[in-house]
Amino acid sequence: MEKGAVTLEGIGGEQIPLERADVVIMNPPFTRQQRIPVSYKEILIKRFSAEVSYIHGQMGYYGYFIILANRFLKDGGRLALVLPASVLNADGLLKVRKFLADQYHIEHIITTWQRAAFSENAQFREILLIAKKKVNKLKDDVCTITELKILPHDLTEARNIAEKIAQISKVKKHGVVYDDKDIQISLFTMDEIRNSVDNLFKFLAFSDKRLVDIWQSITERLGNRLATFGKYLKDNGPLEGVALGQIVKGGGIGYFYIHRTKDRMLKKEDVWLLRETKEDGIDVEHKLLLMTVHIPWRALRCALRRFSGFSTLDISNELDYMVVDDFPDAKIFLKTLDKKLDPNLLSKWNAYTSRLLGNIFLVNHADISAPGTAILSYYSSKMALVPRSMWSMRISDLSAKIFTLWLNSSLNLLQLLLLRRETRGAYLWFVAGDIKKFLVLDVEKLSEDEIGNLLQIFDKVRGVSFPCVLEQLRGRFWARVEIDRAILKVLGFNEQETNQLLDYLYPALTKEIEQLKTLMQG
């Protein structure tokens, strides 16, 4: 390594010898892998050729820093790292998690419920991870999960908390071993950690640890009635919604939407309003220029501009339109954009959007605590396009209806919160790989009567306007209860079991979402 080095190739500066250390403390950059240039990744992989088996192409900078720290740490030494919580379940860090679980005794994972991060002005949730580099694995190695409900105000309080954690870590118990108004401490064996490297986030996904047990007991008891979503999606999703930037840099996709009503025209680029529906197409009007253009059906697709404010499961009759292909007045239409576009680009746009059509949609980057978030998954009887803030999937109409019920159920809400990529509190974020792993009702194993009962419930609630998710849970909104009861019945729960489970889930999930909302505000 060189003092004054300006490139990864080590150019310039005088040599500084680095010795192996007993302790390595780091707060590495949280830069996402998407922002690392491909050429830079190639150099990093070359630099870490000895550890290439731990490197993933979608690994952020902090993953490389963990590997770097290992190079300079003595056997028996300790790592102390400030990391984004996403390190616990991101696919790109799976190899690093396996490396830490195999080569280290992960002694402590510490987080806080008071605010998203320990660092000032940080937007993403953080954890503190302390691990000891070990040569031999011991059966009695324990990982202590500490969740601070209140952050220490000064050094004295911090020292007292550290002493309490150290003392409780020696207790020969399992699960939640200490819980008061300031702190919750849980103990898990390293074998449990190693067996859970796919999703270590589950150990701190909920303040109420019983919720994890409920989900695990359901999957163990009813695994034969559930299947992965990927079994039904196959190659038909999930696909991210449309983005004009995939075809034209800096383009505003709102210019391509035809809005059904004025109240949906919220942004500057939302300029086209549906004026009249005709046999051969639609007439649309520019809200500022007051000019009218006729667009034939062949150049249009049904589309959803944004999911916020849509509160029904079935959006078939609420969809807007999107221009996706060339038409006689296309040049006039494109002239109203804030930049010049070649009409020939519409053929590329058509090919791109055609691949993204779906009939069941899942929200992404959604604030589950927001007043405008009422539905998590939408159904459409017409193939449609959705924005980048949603996932699009294409399956049979029958399965789409049943999965829409499941994805909006309280059992699935429990699953979503457990598997979410932690970013900013109540925001739900998933990647395609996560969604394919979701457990859903195995439609192929349902009887005709069970399918008929579920479709009957779907028809009953498909047009109902749901309040926001929090209000649904707080007030036990009747349509949510109908969905939950129908699904639990299919899964084999009797009346008493159903009542007991829902009586616990509704207030518990409400509390968790409110807690996540507090994280964002803190």
Feature-to-residue mapping (PLM):
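Alpha-helix boundary/N-cap detector
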Residues: 156, 295, 449-452, 474, ...
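Flexible helix-coil linker/hinge segments at domain or subdomain boundaries
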Residues: 460-479, 483-486, 490
